[in-house]
């Protein structure tokens, strides 16, 4: 089967992060052979809606995903906090959120609005997309907000295992990336670095050999046809390289709630999230992981390497 070009592009990280590796690979530091294929299967966007939470909790309970991340400003945070406290060993990070993308379902910051005005659109919500966020957000206000999100999570009994960035806003400018890296190090948390062939040298210069960086990211994009969804992920498994790769999935049930939340937004919408859920919970997906000798790991494992 021909390799999907999207997969090829995303695996650029395998070579990009090599320069930051230590004398031992992450696999070796975790006790595996150097040529091991380690995989984090990661569910984004917990707390956006009950439908997303239910699908993600089910996938976590079934070990179909190994990790997930939480959007602290979102309305269903209390539900996620209850799950986190009931399942303290689950691998839950924070999906640091500086945008609010849905048409009729919006949220604002955790920090007081008067302390982060550059984060707000004219309606008083977080910016609806990455481009206006990139244009308007001041780095010092971004830092104030992401620290507020972390402290809010901690206050609710959530002990995050890692950090990443919703819609990649914190990768959009070097000063925002600097804030992201600074805060992750301050809280002693590993962070996802979404780097690619066009990553500015200023961003790369902010990374250190002490940072625990994964080697690759795979995520479905709008170019993947609905009838090719399963093949996209199965091909990705077959093409895994040695190192640590993360599959980023967006889970949910294609029900009335999620259809309303994601109205007029088919990309990452209800049907998209149902497809992701169907594939990663399927017996075929699990068997292919086993057949290709893929070792499932968590961000919690990587976090131990920082201590």
PLM region spans:
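Catalytic domains of cell-wall/extracellular-matrix polysaccharide-remodeling enzymes
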Residues: 139-212, 217, 222-229, 238, ...
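N-terminal pre-catalytic segment of deacetylase/amide-hydrolase enzymes
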Residues: 3-4, 19-40
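Acidic (Asp/Glu)-rich catalytic clusters
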Residues: 29-31, 56-62, 79-91, 108-121, ...
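Active-site gating loops and adjacent loop-to-helix segments of metal-dependent hydrolytic enzymes
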Residues: 107-133, 261-269
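A short alpha/beta connector and helix-capping loop motif
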Residues: 51-74
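C-terminal domain-boundary segment and adjacent tail
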Residues: 191-194, 265-307
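Structural preference for beta-strand elements that scaffold enzyme active sites
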Residues: 38-40, 65-69, 89-95, 160-164, ...
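Bacterial N-terminal signal peptides
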Residues: 8-17
């Amino acid at each position: 089967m021909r390799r999907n070009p999207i997969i090829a592009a995303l695996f650029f990280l395998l070579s990009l992060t090599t320069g930051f590796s230590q004398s031992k690979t992450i696999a070796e530091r975790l006790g595996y052979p150097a040529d091991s294929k380690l995989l984090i299967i990661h569910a984004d966007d917990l707390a956006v809606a009950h439908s997303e939470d239910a699908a993600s909790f089910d996938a976590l309970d079934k070990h179909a995903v190994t990790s997930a991340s939480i959007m602290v400003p979102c309305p269903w945070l209390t539900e996620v906090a209850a799950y986190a406290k009931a399942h303290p060993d689950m691998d839950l990070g924070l999906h640091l959120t500086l945008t609010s993308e849905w048409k009729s379902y919006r949220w604002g910051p955790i920090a007081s609005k008067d302390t982060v005005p550059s984060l707000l659109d004219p309606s008083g919500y977080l910016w609806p997309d990455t481009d206006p966020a990139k244009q308007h957000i001041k780095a010092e206000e971004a830092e104030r907000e992401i620290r507020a999100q972390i402290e809010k999570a901690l206050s609710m009994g959530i002990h995050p295992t890692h950090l990443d960035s919703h819609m990649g806003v914190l990768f959009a400018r070097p000063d925002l990336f600097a804030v992201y890296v600074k805060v992750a190090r301050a809280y002693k948390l590993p962070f996802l670095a979404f780097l690619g062939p066009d990553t500015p040298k200023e961003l790369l210069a902010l990374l250190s050999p002490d940072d625990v960086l994964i080697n690759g990211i795979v995520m479905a994009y709008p170019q993947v046809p609905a009838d090719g969804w399963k093949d996209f992920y199965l091909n990705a498994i077959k093409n895994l390289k040695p190192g640590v790769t993360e599959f980023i999935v967006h889970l949910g049930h294609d029900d009335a709630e999620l259809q309303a939340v994601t109205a007029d937004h088919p990309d990452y919408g209800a049907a998209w999230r149902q497809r992701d859920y169907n594939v990663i919970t399927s017996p075929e997906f699990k068997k292919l992981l086993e057949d290709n000798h893929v070792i499932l790991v968590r961000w919690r494992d990587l976090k131990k390497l920082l201590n």
